[in-house]
UniProtKB/Swiss-Prot annotation:
GO cellular component, one term: cytosolic large ribosomal subunit
Similarity field: Belongs to the universal ribosomal protein uL3 family.
Gene name as annotated: rplC
Organism: Allorhizobium ampelinum (strain ATCC BAA-846 / DSM 112012 / S4)
Keyword rRNA-binding set for record: yes
Protein name (record): Large ribosomal subunit protein uL3
Gene3D superfamilies: 3.30.160.810, Translation factors
Function: One of the primary rRNA binding proteins, it binds directly near the 3'-end of the 23S rRNA, where it nucleates assembly of the 50S subunit.
Record note on quaternary structure: Part of the 50S ribosomal subunit. Forms a cluster with proteins L14 and L19.
GO biological process, one term: translation
Keyword Ion transport: no
InterPro entries reported for this sequence: Ribosomal_uL3, Ribosomal_uL3_bac/org-type, Ribosomal_uL3_CS, Transl_B-barrel_sf
One example GO MF annotation: structural constituent of ribosome
Keywords in alphabetical order: Methylation, Ribonucleoprotein, Ribosomal protein, RNA-binding, rRNA-binding
Length: 213
């Protein structure tokens, strides 16, 4: 098991493959993704690497974090993520991960925070059909209707799909294909859509279920 990378979502575009077919892709950019620390079994009880990406202003960095960055001999980072790895995949502190970490054709799992939509009704949030247009229905055409409660159990069950805050949740999209990489510009082109807004931080890992596909 090897480390993933921290990337920044640039946006979507399309490219043409060798067969002349256009493929919708999301462009992810690696911005100084470096190893900040190691976690070892002897010292921490597990093996992992801590990565940092982007650039943070020194004035916005705590004194403790400035010490960590200085120990790793790297500039302050805007985003930090820890990846569990096998012992033979530990990397030296300060080493940089580039777009060549992945290769065209392989499958990856991409994690990001979805775009927030604010307070949304049941029709938009859960794709409910709504109530009837007429025949006794007034004002509440787009409501979710009954919540299914009676004297017994006398409550609304947890997880009941209702109106509420939509988006702004952590989502992982699995088995996306890497169309191509550009190591000089630090770009990874992934087939399809990726959760998150432009400029948001994205975590890219080797797909865990690729063998099943």
């Amino acid at each position: 098991m090897r480390s993933g990378v921290i990337a920044q979502k640039v946006g979507m575009t399309r490219v043409y493959n060798d067969a002349g077919e256009h493929v919708p892709v999301t462009v992810l950019r690696l911005d100084n993704c470096q190893v900040l620390a190691q976690r070892t079994v002897d010292k921490h009880g597990y093996t992992a690497v801590q990565l940092g990406a982007g650039q943070a202003k020194v004035k916005n960095t705590s004194k403790a974090m400035r010490g960590n960055f200085a120990a790793a001999n790297v500039e302050p980072k805007a985003k930090l993520v820890e990846f569990r790895v096998s012992e033979d995949n530990l990397m030296d502190v300060g080493s940089e991960l580039k777009a060549g970490h992945f290769e065209a054709g392989q499958l990856v799992d991409v994690t990001g925070t979805t775009i927030g939509k604010g307070f949304a009704g049941a029709m938009k949030r859960h794709n409910f059909g709504g109530l009837r247009a007429t025949h006794g229905v007034s004002v509440s055409h787009r409501s979710h209707g009954s919540t299914g409660s009676n004297q017994d159990p006398g409550k609304v069950w947890k997880g009941k799909r209702m109106a509420g805050h939509m988006g702004q949740t952590r989502v992982t999209t699995q088995n996306l294909e890497v169309v191509s990489t550009d190591e000089d510009r630090g770009l990874i082109l992934v087939k399809g859509a990726v959760p998150g807004s432009k400029g948001s931080w994205i975590i890219v890992r080797d797909a865990v279920k690729s063998a099943a596909k």
